[in-house]
Amino acid sequence: MGPWRVIRVGGQLVRRSAVFLMGLAAMIQLGPAAAMAASMLISLLIYAVAFGLKYAAGFILLLFFHELGHLFASRVVGLRTSAPIFLPFIGAVISLKQLPNNAKTEANIAIGGPAMGTLSALVCLVFYFWTDSLLMLVLAYTACLLNLFNLIPCDPLDGGRIAAAVSPHMWWVGSLVTGVLFFYTYNFIILLIFAVSLLRLWRSEKWDDNSTYYRLSLRQRLRVLWWYLGLLTVLGIATLYIADLLR
């Protein structure tokens, strides 16, 4: 990478960081709904500059419906959450206002996001067949990849929370996968996820201290595993199918 390209990329990073920090400072003063709307707008503007307005709007909606899945699932199990907050080039997050009482409850909430994300991908695919819109096909592919990545069984991804209800030892597999992905992509976000997953593994001796949290019946574990493998299967098949259509 030449010196001028380094300067140009650095300048873009500074500008994007400045926009994000200004938006974050403003959102601190806002209520939950206004903070969600403001973070959504900031993310939309940044994504629009990078990828174009139409794709950016579709991408924001994919993130929104993913988080909506978590919100619905949390309501089903009787837990309250914050409104989604959108973070440019990271995604969107919600936070629980109450802690789950066991790993099964946490897994149910975690499943909601990828489940809604999978549905969003299939809806985009249906719209592609209906309208022959390449944008819809690309959004369907994006949704599949995002939710497949999010199902990697490591903390802090949804897959890590789902896998914990099956066996916390699945986190070792997730850390290995994210480590391999980083060495293939050199993506900074993947590096952060890899680091967090390693920290979680390092603290894994606390499993015994809080064993009741992970003490689930075989039926509960198998039910979570069924959802997990089902989502992986549907997303995997859809990803391969859409990739073939994009060729």
Model-predicted segments: where are they?
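Hydrophobic transmembrane alpha-helices and their immediate loop junctions
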Residues: M1-R247
